C-alpha cells in the first residue's frame, strides 16, 4: 500500500547506477515489486547488459545461468541464494541485495545488447532472446501509441516482469508516466 513518486524512483536509480561499473553483465532475479523495477531500470539506463530471470525459477537453474554467463553483478532477493556471502555486497535494500561477483568484466560487450530475456524457464533449458536499446525503445513507444497510454492511466502488474508481456506493461507505462500498481499475485 505504499506510493512512490517518479522523483523517488529516479533518485534510487541514480544511486544504484553509481555503484556499478560500465560494460558489466548483471543477473537480475526479479519479482513484481518496486525494488525489482528500480534495479531493472538502473541497469537498463546504465547501458549494461541485464539477464532477467523470474524469482520463481529454481536456484539450481539460476546457478546454471550464472556459470554460463558469468555475471559481474547479481541483483536478487535477500536470502534467495545461500552463497551470497562469498561475493562482495554492494547494496542491501529492504528485500533485495546487489553483489559484485568474482567474474572478470567482459572486454568486448556488444553495446547494442541491453537485455537477455529467458524463453525456456519452464523447460530448465537456458535460452535467451537478446534485446537492444533500440528494440526496447521502439517496442515501448509502439505499445504506448497503439494503446493510447498516457500519464493519466493506471495499470496493474499481473504477469511476472521477467516475462516479455509483463515487462512490456512496466516499460510502456513507466515511459508514459502512468501509475503502476505493483502486484505479485497473478
Outline where the language-model segments fall.
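ATP-dependent adenylate-forming carboxylate-activation enzymes
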Residues: 12, 30, 51-66, 178-186
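Conserved AMP-binding/adenylate-forming
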Residues: 15-56, 158-160
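Proline-aspartate-enriched helix->loop->beta-strand connector
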Residues: 70-74
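Conserved AMP-binding A3 loop
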Residues: 5-6, 113-141
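Flexible, low-complexity linker/hinge segments
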Residues: 88-114
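Conserved AMP-binding/adenylate-forming core of the ANL superfamily
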Residues: 1-20, 60-63, 131-134
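Conserved AMP-binding/adenylation subdomain of ANL enzymes
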Residues: 137-154, 162-186
